[in-house]
């Protein structure tokens, strides 16, 4: 029986800004259908790790693999960059990212926001994309907002539209960077429910979050980052229920207060 490679794999990733080392040898893997949550204090390297995974930023050393395919690099250290632009474009289109700030185009309707990348980047048929975009907006509870402008939506609705936009690219994996942290608690739950639905469908996701309940409820694996290193990782029930690291115990106590 053939074993599928991980959907995403990070090997010994190092990333620094000048003398500040933000990631100091991080490795993890997400199997197809896995939900991996990255938790930790602000400044621990979570968002940087996600951006390096999607090649929005480049690491100084280490490997990024998508479905077993390693990124080709040229140069070393701070001059390192991908050697194959076509490879980067292809992999990025299969790794849709949802940001903390929704980043919807203010001059486009909600429907056009969701359609824009598949039509302009993937050169897909607009009629086919529109049908798909309407379906994804309905999926996230915004079927009646297709013709609305982003300014007419609440924060929770804008983030759900951003998730629909990411899904419309038909990615193999979703990367979500603090998708609920800019929202008040009531609006946050709108987005949490969508993420829970996606997890139940078996979507491969890597989520950076400060929401410990979300991480515990939807994750197959949770990684606690501290000062650019993986301090502890494991199944959510084990990591939250019986943390081994004193630093993790302190963190969980602080976020629960």
Please place each PLM-identified region on the residue numbering.
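Catalytic Walker B motif of ABC-type/P-loop ATPase nucleotide-binding domains
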Residues: 174-177
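A short, surface-exposed alpha-helical micro-motif characterized by mixed small hydrophobic
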Residues: 215-217
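ABC ATPase "signature
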Residues: 233-234
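Conserved ABC ATPase signature
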Residues: 149-153, 157
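Conserved ABC transporter NBD signature motif
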Residues: 62-76
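A short, proline-enriched helix->beta-strand linker immediately N-terminal to the Walker B motif
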Residues: 168-172
């Amino acid at each position: 029986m053939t074993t599928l490679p991980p959907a995403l794999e990070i090997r010994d990733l190092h990333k620094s800004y000048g003398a500040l080392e933000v990631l100091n040898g991080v490795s993890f893997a997400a199997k197809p259908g896995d939900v991996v949550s990255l938790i930790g204090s602000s400044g621990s390297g979570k968002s940087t790790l996600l951006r390096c995974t999607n090649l929005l930023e480049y690491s100084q050393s280490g490997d990024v693999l998508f479905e077993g395919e390693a990124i080709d690099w040229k140069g070393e250290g701070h001059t390192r960059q991908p050697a194959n632009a076509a490879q980067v474009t292809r992999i990025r289109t299969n790794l849709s990212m949802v940001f903390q700030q929704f980043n919807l185009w203010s001059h486009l309707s909600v429907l056009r926001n969701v359609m824009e990348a598949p039509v302009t980047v993937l050169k897909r048929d607009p009629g086919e994309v529109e049908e798909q975009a309407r379906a994804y907006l309905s999926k996230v509870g915004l079927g009646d907002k297709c013709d609305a402008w982003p300014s007419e939506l609440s924060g929770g609705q804008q983030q759900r539209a951003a998730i629909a936009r990411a899904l419309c690219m038909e990615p193999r994996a979703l990367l979500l960077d603090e998708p609920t942290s800019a929202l008040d608690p009531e609006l946050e739950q709108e987005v949490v429910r969508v993420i829970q639905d996606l997890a139940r469908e078996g979507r491969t996701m890597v989520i950076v979050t400060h929401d410990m309940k979300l991480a515990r409820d939807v994750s197959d694996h949770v990684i606690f980052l501290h000062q650019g290193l993986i301090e502890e990782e494991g199944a959510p029930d084990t990591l939250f229920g019986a943390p081994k690291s004193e630093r993790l115990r302190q963190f969980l106590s602080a976020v629960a207060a």
